[in-house]
Amino acid sequence: MSSNSDHHISVEHTDGVATIRFTRPSKHNAASAQLLLETLEALYRLESDDSVGAIVLTGEGAVFSAGFDLEEVPMGPASEIQSHFRLKALYYHAVIHMLARIEKPTLAAINGPAVGGGLGMSLACDLAVCTDRATFLPAWMSIGIANDASSSFYLPRIVGYRRAMEWLLTNRTLGADEAYEWGVVNRVFSEADFQSRVGEIARQLAAAPTHLQGLVKNRIQEGSSETLESCTEHEVQNVIASVGHPHFAERLAMFRSKEMRSSALAVDLDAVCGGR
């Protein structure tokens, strides 16, 4: 997909990594209806692309995303405005649901402020990293809109109930270091190192077996709302599915062979456990 003015995102492929880049820097990468639909279409295509092992979401320029594009809000009566937000919310949530459903790991590379729905989209990714100049702002309270973009689902799961309530009710801005302390991001990198470090992480994710990553995502997402018995039963089902995959046969053969000891691709249990 090209990054010209006809599109609100670009998609780049390098070393098994697909990068979805929001390309509206003059609008602070605000989520237009077109941007959301293009992002959704890109995720659909990337899901079935076997050459892609990991997906990065990031913004062009100095901002990750400012959330809903308020310039698209119609000037009509309240009913028209409500219809507009209903449709935009459905687009937004379709993207959020796809980020959860896709087997491949997703990484939010937060290059600058993540505001409102932009914050919500970053929370919906499996991992998140940011530059040391990134900031995070719920913003819904300040513009008179109830929080959405899956924030009520992901935020308390990521930062805990008290912090989620504090953040949404006070609407204060978190800097990169505090976002890391709260668990909003996994890592903070200097702006100079950001792109190279994002590339390193994304390539590492892309090199891992997608089917196992999908099983991990499913269990982590579903396990928090299950009983212990249900969770462990589903784990058994996933283990059985994974050992029936050719990847396991390959790794088992490596484990049983002498070559395994010098392989960087397999765990040396003697080294880990202190055996001979």
From Swiss-Prot:
It holds the Pfam family ECH_1. Optimum temperature is 45 degrees Celsius. Activity is lost after 5 minutes incubation at 60 degrees Celsius, but one-fifth of this activity is restored after cooling to 45 degrees Celsius. SUPFAM superfamilies: ClpP/crotonase. It catalyses: 4-chlorobenzoyl-CoA + H2O = 4-hydroxybenzoyl-CoA + chloride + H(+). It comes from the Bacteria. The active site is at H93, D148. Its EC number is 3.8.1.7. Substrate binds at A66, G67, F68, D69, L70, E71, G117, R261. Optimum pH is 8.0 in MOPS buffer at 30 degrees Celsius, 7.5 in 0.1 M potassium phosphate buffer at 30 degrees Celsius, and 7.4 in 20 mM potassium phosphate/2 mM DTT buffer at 30 degrees Celsius. Retains full activity in MOPS buffer between pH 6.5 and 10.0. Is irreversibly damaged below pH 6.5 in MOPS buffer, enzyme treated at pH 6.0 in MOPS buffer only regains 40% of its original activity after re-equilibration at pH 7.2. When treated at pH 5.2 or 10.1 in 20 mM potassium phosphate/2 mM DTT buffer activity is lost completely, but is recovered within 17 minutes following readjustment to pH 7.4. Gene3D superfamilies: 2-enoyl-CoA Hydratase, Chain A, domain 1, Lyase 2-enoyl-coa Hydratase, Chain A, domain 2. Keywords: Hydrolase. Transmembrane segments: none annotated. One of its GO terms (biological process) is coenzyme A metabolic process. InterPro entries: ClpP/crotonase-like_dom_sf, ECH/Chromodomain_protein, Enoyl-CoA_hyd/isom_CS, Enoyl-CoA_hydra/iso, Enoyl-CoA_hydra_C. GO terms for molecular function: 4-chlorobenzoyl-CoA dehalogenase activity. Pathway: Xenobiotic degradation; 4-chlorobenzoate degradation; 4-hydroxybenzoate from 4-chlorobenzoate: step 2/3. Dehalogenates 4-chlorobenzoyl-CoA, 4-iodobenzoyl-CoA, 4-bromobenzoyl-CoA and, at a slower rate, 4-fluorobenzoyl-CoA. Does not dehalogenate 2-chlorobenzoyl-CoA or 3-chlorobenzoyl-CoA. Homotetramer. Belongs to the enoyl-CoA hydratase/isomerase family. This is 4-chlorobenzoyl coenzyme A dehalogenase-2.
